Curated annotation (Swiss-Prot):
Coiled coil: none annotated. Keywords: Acetylation, Oxidoreductase, Peroxisome, Phosphoprotein, Purine metabolism. One of its GO terms (cellular component) is peroxisome. The keyword Oxidoreductase applies. Catalyzes the oxidation of uric acid to 5-hydroxyisourate, which is further processed to form (S)-allantoin. The keyword Amino-acid biosynthesis does not apply. This is Uricase. Belongs to the uricase family. The modification N6-acetyllysine is found at K10, K23, K27, K36, K118, K122, K164, K175, K185, K221, K228, K278. Its main location: other. It holds the Pfam family Uricase. One of its GO terms (biological process) is purine nucleobase catabolic process. It comes from the Eukaryota. It comes from Macaca fascicularis.
Length: 304
């Protein structure tokens, strides 16, 4: 029988690159009651902690470990006593708690995702306590803080599905013996936006308003003017245009990462049925799909 405890001792030829442990998908619904007017935040939170020692890994010594069940309970208690003004502020509260409460925690990383509830509204009148789930882009954030430094905050949008039926094309690409894709001047353009940005400072930032502004800018650049749209020669160009517009309009952010899958819709051939399909009936194709990514940041000279 293998002697696991004796065979796997500290190895001087190895070193840790990074360690962490925590609790994922801690779900909370926080209700703020101001008389009969109620406000809600529902979130899913994941917490990762890094400790100053590695004795739990090296020797199976658990004396420094904060149980992950305790981490879960802490998230619940912080929601009660701190509330959830924004998911970014909540993430900072969690990081600060673990770093200030446990001297051997040297790094805290928190991911928070907000479930998209929207208050019911009719004819300009907002309901006092009823909400509807509106999955038109998910707000998420990542907060990381080291013991020796301030929190670093990323915010983002994911699962924002958008489509336009014209004002998009793809021409002038490389053609070789394996190319079957024809050039096209007019096509459907559909994607599911993933967009993440970093704040260069966290004081006096209205995270909720900034997120809403960037979401509006993404939609503005994708769609173009409401009466005529805006032509996109490639997904790459649209991606970059979104980044340029966002960093020019939102001075609080330092960089932006975007991922845009190119979700295909193909014209269905009806010629065998004696019909001409003029891009009226299309076939959505989930897989495979193109994926275009890009990250930009402000040049150092632009920050001086």
């Amino acid at each position: 029988m293998a002697d696991y405890h004796n065979n796997y001792k500290k190895n001087d030829e190895l070193e840790f690159v990074r360690t962490g442990y925590g609790k994922d998908m801690v779900k909370v619904l926080h209700i703020q009651r101001d008389g009969k007017y109620h406000s809600i935040k529902e979130v899913a939170t994941s917490v990762q902690l890094t400790l100053s020692s590695k004795k739990d890994y090296l020797h199976g010594d658990n004396s420094d470990i904060i149980p992950t069940d305790t981490i879960k309970n802490t998230v619940h208690v912080l929601a009660k006593f701190k509330g959830i003004k924004s998911i970014e502020a909540f993430g900072v509260n969690i990081c600060e708690y673990f770093l200030s409460s446990f001297n051997h925690v040297i790094r805290a990383q928190v991911y928070v995702e907000e479930i998209p509830w929207k208050r019911l509204e009719k004819n300009g009148v907002k309901h006092v306590h009823a909400f509807i789930h509106t999955p038109t882009g998910t707000h998420f954030c990542e907060v990381e803080q080291l013991r020796s430094g301030p929190p670093v905050i990323h915010s983002g949008i994911k699962d924002l599905k958008v489509l336009k039926t014209t004002q998009s094309g793809f021409e002038g690409f490389i053609k070789d013996q394996f190319t079957t894709l024809p050039e096209v001047k007019d096509r459907c353009f559909a994607t599911q936006v993933y967009c993440k940005w970093r704040y260069h400072q966290c004081r006096d930032v209205d995270f909720e308003a900034t997120w809403g502004t960037i979401r509006d800018l993404v939609l503005e650049k994708f769609a173009g003017p409401y009466d005529k749209g805006e032509y996109s020669p490639s997904v790459q160009k649209t991606l970059y245009d979104i980044q340029v517009l966002s960093l020019s309009r939102v001075p609080e952010i330092e960089d932006m990462e975007i991922s845009l899958p190119n979700i295909h819709y193909f014209n269905i051939d009806m010629s065998k049925m004696g019909l001409i399909n003029k891009e009226e009936v299309l076939l959505p194709l989930d897989n495979p799909y193109g994926k275009i990514t890009g990250t930009v940041k402000r040049k150092l000279s632009s920050r001086l």
